[in-house]
C-alpha cells in the first residue's frame, strides 16, 4: 500500500481547497449525483468487500450485508429521498425590534473535511460520515484504518472510481500520516476511534479552531432487572456482545444483573455460548495480535470465575466467546473498554445501587441497555444515567435508524450523525436577514 509524502498530502489538500472555492460541491444536483456514484461504486465492489472484511476481521457475509454495505446503502437512499427538504431555507419570524425584514436560516458547507475511519466497521463508519460530508456540500479527505489493510484498499478503490481526488480522496497511512494531516487547517474533522486518540485529534483541531465530531466508546452496561424476560435478554446478549468478536463501540461491555435472576440468566447464556459459539474463532477475528494479547492479559489478571471460553490463539487473532462471573468494580476487566468477546458479570441488589454504581465507576457511556418489563422502572434508569444513547429490551439497533442521532457524551464522544443529523453536523447554520 502506497503512502503519500507530506508534500503530496499538502498538494492534495490545496487542490481540495481550490475545488471547494469553485462552489461546485454546493449544487444540490451535484450532491445527489455524488451519492449515486458512491452507491454504484459500493455495489460494484461488493465481492471485494466481502473478501477484504473476511480477511481483516473474519466477518461473514450476513454481518457485512447488515452492518457494513447494507447500512451504507440505506443511508445513501435515505439522504437521496430527503435532501431537497433538508437544504431548503427555514423561514423564521422577525421580532418588532428588527422589523420589517425577512429572516431565515440556511445550512452552509464547512469546506474541506477530514474523516478518520476506524477498524471495527471500516466500511460503515468511514463511508457513512462521508455521506454527511457530501450532502453538506463539502470536499473530503479520508484516512481509513491501517489495521484493516485489505478493506482500506477496497475503500480507496471505491472512492477513486466514484470521485475526482480534488473532491474526495483517500490517504492511506498510520500515525505519521495522520499527524501530518492533523497539522493542516481543515474546516471540519470527523473522528471515530478511541478516547485517547480522540484527545489528540481535538488538541490538533484546537490549533486551527476546527470543529470536530468525536465518535468514541466506553463501557456500555447491560442492566437486567428482576422482571426481565431472560430468554429475550440472552438473545440480545448473543447478538450484541459477540458479533464482530465484541469489537463494536455500542456493544454491551459488561452485564450488570439483579442477584435474584443472575444464576438463571447465566445458565441460559452459558449454554447458548457453548452450543452456538463453540469454536475459538466463532465470533470472528480480533483486529491485531496485540489486541488478543491485551485481552488474554486481562483474563489472566481477573479475580472472577470463567464460566465458558477464554481459549485464545494469537496467531489466528482469535479468542473464544467468554463469560466471567463474580467480577467486582475494581477488577482488571472493568479497568477499560474491552472491545472483545469477553463479558464480565456483576450483580446488584437494588435499582438505586445499579444507577449509582454505573454513574460512579463508568459514567457517560456511549449506550445504556436496560432489560425489564416495568417500563416506568426501566425508563427511570435510562433517565438517571447520562449516555449517548439508550435502549430498553434491545441492543445496538438504534444505530441503524436514520431518524435517530448517533453519538456520545463526555468521554464517549461529542457530536452526532445519521440521516438529517449528518446533514446538520456537516453544515454551518447561517442566519440571514433581508431588509426590503
From Swiss-Prot:
GO terms of molecular function: benzaldehyde dehydrogenase (NAD+) activity; benzaldehyde dehydrogenase (NADP+) activity; nucleotide binding
Binding residue positions for NADP(+): 117-119, 143-147, 175-178, 193-194, 215-216, 249, 337-339
Functional pathway: Aromatic compound metabolism; (R)-mandelate degradation; benzoate from (R)-mandelate: step 4/4
UniProt entry tagged with the keyword Isomerase: no
GO BP annotation list: aldehyde metabolic process; mandelate catabolic process
A GO cellular component annotation in the UniProt record: cytoplasm
Catalytic function, reaction form: benzaldehyde + NAD(+) + H2O = benzoate + NADH + 2 H(+); benzaldehyde + NADP(+) + H2O = benzoate + NADPH + 2 H(+)
UniProt keyword terms in alphabetical order: NAD, NADP, Nucleotide-binding, Oxidoreductase
Listed InterPro entries: Ald_DH/histidinol_DH, Ald_DH_C, Ald_DH_CS_CYS, Ald_DH_N, Aldehyde_DH_dom, Aldehyde_DH_NAD(P), BenzalDHMdlD
Function: NAD or NADP-dependent benzaldehyde dehydrogenase that catalyzes the conversion of benzaldehyde into benzoate in the (R)-mandelate degradation pathway.
This protein's name: NAD(P)-dependent benzaldehyde dehydrogenase
Natural source organism: Pseudomonas putida
Amino acid at each position: 500500500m502506497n503512502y503519500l509524502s507530506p508534500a503530496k498530502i499538502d498538494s492534495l489538500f490545496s487542490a481540495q481547497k481550490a475545488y471547494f472555492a469553485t462552489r461546485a460541491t454546493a449544487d444540490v444536483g451535484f450532491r445527489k449525483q455524488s451519492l449515486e456514484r458512491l452507491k454504484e461504486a459500493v455495489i460494484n465492489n461488493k465481492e471485494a468487500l466481502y473478501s477484504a472484511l473476511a480477511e481483516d476481521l473474519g466477518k461473514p457475509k450476513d454481518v457485512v450485508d447488515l452492518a457494513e454495505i447494507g447500512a451504507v446503502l440505506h443511508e445513501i437512499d435515505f439522504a437521496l429521498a430527503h435532501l431537497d427538504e433538508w437544504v431548503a431555507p427555514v423561514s423564521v419570524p422577525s421580532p418588532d425590534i428588527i422589523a420589517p425584514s425577512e429572516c431565515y436560516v440556511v445550512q452552509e458547507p464547512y469546506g474541506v473535511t477530514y474523516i478518520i475511519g476506524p477498524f471495527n466497521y471500516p466500511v460503515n463508519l468511514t463511508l457513512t460520515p462521508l455521506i454527511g460530508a457530501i450532502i453538506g456540500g463539502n470536499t473530503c479527505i479520508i484516512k481509513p484504518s491501517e489495521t484493516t489493510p485489505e478493506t482500506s484498499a477496497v475503500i480507496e478503490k471505491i472512492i477513486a472510481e466514484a470521485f475526482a481526488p480534488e473532491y474526495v480522496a483517500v490517504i492511506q497511512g498510520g500515525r505519521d500520516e495522520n499527524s501530518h494531516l492533523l497539522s493542516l487547517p481543515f474546516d471540519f474533522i470527523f473522528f471515530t476511534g478511541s478516547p485517547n486518540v480522540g484527545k489528540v485529534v481535538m488538541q490538533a483541531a484546537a490549533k486551527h479552531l476546527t470543529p470536530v465530531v468525536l465518535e468514541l466508546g466506553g463501557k456500555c452496561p447491560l442492566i437486567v432487572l428482576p422482571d426481565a424476560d431472560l430468554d429475550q435478554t440472552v438473545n440480545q446478549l448473543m447478538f450484541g456482545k459477540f458479533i464482530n468478536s465484541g469489537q463494536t463501540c455500542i456493544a454491551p461491555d459488561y452485564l450488570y444483573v439483579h442477584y435474584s435472576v443472575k444464576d438463571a440468566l447465566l445458565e441460559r447464556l452459558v449454554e447458548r455460548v457453548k452450543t452456538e459459539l463453540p469454536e475459538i474463532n466463532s465470533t470472528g477475528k480480533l483486529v491485531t495480535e496485540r489486541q488478543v494479547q491485551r485481552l488474554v492479559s486481562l483474563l489472566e489478571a481477573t479475580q472472577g470465575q470463567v464460566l465458558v471460553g477464554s481459549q485464545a490463539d494469537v496467531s489466528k487473532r482469535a479468542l473464544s466467546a467468554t463469560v466471567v462471573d463474580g467480577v467486582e468494580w475494581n477488577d482488571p476487566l472493568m479497568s477499560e473498554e474491552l472491545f472483545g468477546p469477553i463479558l464480565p458479570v456483576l450483580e446488584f441488589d437494588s435499582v438505586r445501587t445499579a444507577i449509582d454504581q454505573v454513574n460512579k465507576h463508568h459514567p457517560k457511556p456511549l449506550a445504556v441497555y436496560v432489560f425489564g418489563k416495568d417500563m416506568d422502572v426501566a425508563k427511570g434508569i435510562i433517565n438517571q444515567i447520562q449516555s449517548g444513547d439508550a435502549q430498553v429490551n434491545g441492543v445496538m439497533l438504534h444505530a441503524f435508524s436514520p431518524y435517530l442521532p448517533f453519538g456520545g457524551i463526555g468521554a464517549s464522544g461529542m457530536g452526532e450523525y445519521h440521516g438529517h443529523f449528518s446533514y446538520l453536523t456537516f453544515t454551518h447554520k447561517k442566519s440571514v436577514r433581508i431588509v426590503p
